[in-house]
Amino acid sequence: MVSLSCLISYGECLLETVQTHPWSTIGVVVFLSSVKNAPLMWHARLIIAVFYHSVTRKNDVVTIERYGRQGLFGYIVTSSRSPLYECDINGHKSDSTYFSDLDINRIHLITRLFKGAGDLSLRPDRPNVAPEDRPKKMRVLLGGTCCSFRREIKPYAAYEIHSRVLAWDEKWLYVVSYFVKPGSARKMASLQTEVGDKCEMTDLARSMVFTSAITKFVFKDGRKTVRPADALEEMGLLSASEEVVETSEAGEDLWTRSRVEERRKTGIKIAQHFIALDELHDQFEHVSEHPFLGKFGVLGTMF
């Protein structure tokens, strides 16, 4: 009875506050429901992600010995919602806000998967490689990203972002990201055992995706560019051996280097379309050939 009376008293006080300060109450509610967009919140989320993987879970390293060769293609999943401040005049998540969500998701992927890039103590021994030939402190730098929007995300709707390594070439490593409905991965896993038709599975997967994105990263050792394959081998994520390995997390790893290469080639076919966008930089040379329609500042013609 004491707890019930306390709840009733608390409710009455809350109601009185709302009636006395309605606009302040609305402001507090809007702020709390949009705390994701508070000043410096993006920086806080990024720092927390880096601290968690680099300090709290520093020794939790992804290697072939633990996760098998398929560990390189493992997903990182982050969850979020689309608060009021992220919605545009059309009443759904604004296109520009997808990129800030991708920043947080990808920093989780990079600091989880590529821990050995910046910390030599987390890399496996490579007795066949001379110490002077091994890259020292590698950085993983963003080179470009592109989003393809499929379906809108409603205000305050929940969604997940799934990201993994897609492929790599002589310079770039490509990461694919999907904005999907919560629980989509579990649903797809259960449906794979029930639905045998590949076309039907593709349609089901497509129906769960709000937006897809592709990003390219480059590995740098000082000013020197490190080939992605060399960087992955250096961090123990890629092996030239074809033998089957016993892993501590996934049991027997049935993935061979040939299968990894097959998956890479499949991914690079998709990445080729993204690579072709680099030719856009050359098109600015034609700027003088077209009419000038106006110049505007932050508030139109005022500033």
UniProtKB/Swiss-Prot annotation:
Keywords: Transferase. SUPFAM superfamilies: Thioesterase/thiol ester dehydrase-isomerase (SSF54637). InterPro entries: HotDog_dom_sf (IPR029069), THEM6_lcsJ_thioesterase (IPR051490). The keyword Membrane does not apply. It is an enzyme of class 2 (transferase). The keyword Transferase applies. Induction: Expression is positively regulated by the oxaleimides biosynthesis cluster-specific transcription factor poxB. Pfam families: 4HBT_2. One of its GO terms (molecular function) is transferase activity. Its EC number is 2.3.1.-. Pathway: Secondary metabolite biosynthesis. Thioesterase; part of the gene cluster that mediates the biosynthesis of oxaleimides, cytotoxic compounds containing an unusual disubstituted succinimide moiety. The first step of the pathway is provided by the HR-PKS poxF that serves in a new mode of collaborative biosynthesis with the PKS-NRPS poxE, by providing the olefin containing amino acid substrate via the synthesis of an ACP-bound dec-4-enoate. Belongs to the lcsJ thioesterase family. This is Thioesterase poxG. The gene is poxG.
